[in-house]
Amino acid sequence: ISVVDYIDRAIEWAAKYNIRVLLDLATVPGGQGDSNDSPATPEAVAEWHSSTNGRHVALDVLERLADRYGEAESLLGIELLDTPQMSVRKSLFTMTDGIPAHYLRNFYRDAYELVRSYMPEDKIVVFSSSGHPSEWKHFMRGAKYKNVYMDLHLYHYRDEYALDITSPRGLTTAISRNKRELKEAISTGFPVL
């Protein structure tokens, strides 16, 4: 059974049981650096942006998904890329590993245009905050962008407190961080998942 057959089934079942499906491009050639399979997975690399065809393959897959399912009543929308690791400023002269923010922004704009050409405006288009919600404050704010959501993805297994997450201190720290990130995300003006 192909992946498309499983998606077809999910769309059919969702229609039957009156639920909605959010399709998510979970991985891309070269990797987007999320490695969110399990805490035991080694740190992933984000080489997708520097591969010769990674961007084109991702856009092709998104176009195929939007073309096939964009009009389905049970489709909630499409998430353009799942938790890519974005490169951010570490200090005055250094950046963290990951995909440059300008590359992600350009990809998201191009992907939005592509999927929106197949999907009506009542379907949502979702982009990942990449763990830095405040970096997206003025992004996709023009009138041509309709029904755009930000995915926050509050993960903890890779942060500095992951080993202590079950202790009172670890839980307090995680809750505090979640509140801060959620507040930052809401301040961008996007609906937040």
What is each model feature region?
Residues 1-77, 107-114:
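An active-site-proximal structural segment forming one wall of the substrate-binding cleft
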